[in-house]
């Protein structure tokens, strides 16, 4: 199973004299249950991740807040009993820039788009994932030549390891309990729009164009925290970490105002989505904020995406399940192999139609956690390689996967 990377060591892990306020803040953000960090120590990722960049002064403010509860500035003044409002505002700005805090402007949207102008800014203490653990990895500096860099990760590479740990340790042993749709915890895969546009019954929320039109007044593109984190840990791919992940609505404003993203329009967002499809990336959204609300669209590479890892590594597809299930009609299938090659989850493989002396070859169905006990023996640590297996051990007719010319000849 994935272990803590040795590529980004933090001096705060296993500190003999841990900072009490940071321990307390780690417990607060983790939640009441605290599993698996109920007895928080300096060895735990919530501690050393926060200790890397969060000051005690910031912790004092955050500890006054409830997780995922919005507060206006006047409410923050009352909450913290601040005598110097200018100093508090500066501190809130710093916490927002780091990603310890998020903020919105009242969320004035319905099915058709914006319903009212932005109202007063509301500060929110997010959970770790999705939330501060990934926002810590997002910092965008634009150089004179137009190139981009991430000064925060360059100075604090351990933040990449922090994000990785917070997408693994808290979920281990839990993912099999997640129902279809992710229950607000996982990411929801949105299929390529061209693949569902002919279906009159498809819901608006299953179309990326719907979400982009809904939030058309506020769209931004920012750095992919998964790609950035993996690159720091030297497990990345050749993808550019910038200009893939799209923020919408108030979150788009937050990205731009805190230096984590760049404003774009609807047309540019659609170009990014098309480019992602051309590269074989997976579109994902999250419904953590409630029904008919999203804050972003991720264009995910299965080799580096932590959300897809959660479903693939733990072998629990509900974590990222789409509302659509692809099915193959054996009679109509000509074994062209396209679905096998394109599916990032390795959901289909090539088999053979030719019968054996005992009749047609029977292929096993994928085991699901809904019907079996689910332990580490069911995990697939080699999911990246497993998903690239194109055919069953029995072989395939046609033998496209082995043919030097890559030609499918139906057998």
Locations of regions flagged by a protein language model:
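Short, amphipathic alpha-helical interaction segments positioned at domain boundaries
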Residues: 110-164
């Amino acid at each position: 199973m994935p272990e803590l990377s040795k590529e980004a060591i933090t001096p705060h892990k296993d500190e003999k004299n841990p900072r009490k306020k940071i321990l307390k803040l780690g417990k607060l953000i983790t939640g009441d249950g605290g599993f698996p960090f109920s007895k928080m120590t300096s060895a735990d990722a919530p501690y050393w991740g926060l200790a890397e960049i969060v000051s005690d002064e910031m912790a004092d403010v955050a500890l006054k807040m409830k997780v995922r509860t919005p507060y206006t500035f006047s409410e923050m003044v009352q909450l913290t009993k601040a005598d110097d409002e200018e100093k508090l505002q500066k501190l809130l700005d710093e916490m927002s820039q780091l990603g310890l805090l998020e903020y919105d402007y009242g969320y004035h949207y319905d099915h058709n788009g914006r319903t009212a102008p932005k109202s007063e800014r509301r500060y929110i203490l997010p959970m770790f994932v999705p939330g501060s653990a990934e926002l810590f990895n997002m910092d965008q500096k634009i150089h004179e030549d137009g190139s981009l860099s991430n000064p925060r990760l360059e100075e604090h590479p351990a933040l990449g390891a922090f994000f990785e740990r917070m997408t693994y340790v808290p979920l281990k042993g839990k993912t099999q309990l997640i129902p279809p749709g992710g229950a607000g915890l996982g990411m929801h895969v949105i299929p390529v729009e061209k693949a569902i546009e002919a279906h009159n019954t498809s819901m608006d929320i299953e179309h990326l164009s719907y979400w982009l039109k809904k939030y058309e007044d506020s769209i931004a593109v920012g750095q992919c925290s998964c790609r950035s984190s993996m690159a720091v840990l030297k497990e990345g791919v050749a993808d550019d970490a910038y200009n893939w992940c799209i923020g919408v609505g108030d979150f788009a404003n937050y990205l731009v105002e805190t230096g984590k993203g760049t404003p774009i329009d609807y047309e540019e967002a659609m170009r990014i989505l098309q480019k992602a499809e051309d590269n074989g990336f997976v579109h994902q959204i999250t419904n953590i904020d409630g029904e008919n609300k999203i804050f972003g669209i991720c264009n995910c590479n299965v080799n580096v995406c932590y959300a897809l890892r959660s479903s693939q590594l733990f072998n629990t597809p509900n974590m990222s399940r789409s509302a659509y299930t692809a099915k193959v009609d054996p009679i109509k299938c000509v074994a062209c192999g396209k679905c096998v090659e394109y599916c990032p989850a390795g959901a289909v493989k090539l088999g053979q139609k030719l019968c054996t002396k005992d009749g047609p070859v029977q292929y096993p169905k994928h085991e699901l956690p809904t019907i079996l006990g689910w332990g580490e023996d069911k995990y697939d640590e080699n999911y990246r390689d497993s998903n690239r297996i194109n055919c069953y051990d029995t072989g395939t007719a046609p033998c496209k996967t082995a043919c030097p010319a890559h030609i499918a000849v139906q057998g």
